[in-house]
Design a protein with these regions (language model features):
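Surface-exposed, flexible loop/turn segments at secondary-structure boundaries
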Residues: 66, 117, 160
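Structural signature of eukaryotic scaffold interfaces centered on beta-propeller domains
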Residues: 13-17, 89-94, 100, 151-153
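A generic, well-ordered mixed alpha/beta core segment in the N-terminal half of proteins
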Residues: 72-140
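General small-molecule cofactor/ligand-binding pocket signal
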Residues: 59, 80-86, 144-149
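N-terminal leader/transition segments
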Residues: 1-74
Length: 160
């Protein structure tokens, strides 16, 4: 079937102020971004997760190598679920799925292609393959459809 304007599903990205189920964070560990074994960054991430976990779910993506450490620091924090997922850095907003709602209000995730903010020409770091898989992992884990970036077009309300 050919996709036309009439049969195309329309999605919208909810505002940050709208009710939502939870958020995704990535446990910091990458030496190029976090000095001293990321100890201070991890303490800060624990505080953020504690604050958020009071009012909504926190899904913390943690590498296999860091899982025991994360359990020790986050194991008693209310609302936090640890999920084993290998990543290249800790920027869930940039590498994760953009959650959108379809016309019926069902949640879907958009999997944008992540390239470390510039790719092979000017990217911040060379290996971002793990980060590029995070969005699909989040969608699978949360049980929501994952929209391919190639079939997604952004429009503002002024354009519609």
């Amino acid at each position: 079937m050919e996709v036309t304007e009439k049969n195309r599903t329309k999605y919208r990205m909810p505002g940050e102020f709208e009710p939502h189920e939870g958020c995704v964070m990535i446990w910091p560990e990458r030496p190029g971004s976090w000095n001293y074994g990321a100890r201070e960054a991890q303490k800060a991430f624990v505080k953020v997760a504690e604050a958020i976990g009071v009012s909504e779910k926190v899904y913390m993506l943690v590498s296999k190598a860091q899982m025991e450490n994360a359990k020790n620091q986050l194991g008693n924090v209310s609302g936090v679920t640890l999920l084993e997922c290998e990543t290249d850095d800790a920027w869930a907003r940039d590498v994760g799925a953009t959650m959108v709602l379809d016309e019926k209000g069902a949640v879907c995730g958009v999997d944008w292609q992540f390239n470390a903010w510039g790719g092979t020409f000017d990217g911040l770091y060379r290996n971002w393959e793990k980060d590029d898989r995070v969005a699909a992992f989040i969608c699978r884990t949360l049980g929501c459809p994952c929209l391919d970036r190639k079939s997604t077009r952004l429009n503002s309300s002024h354009r519609l």
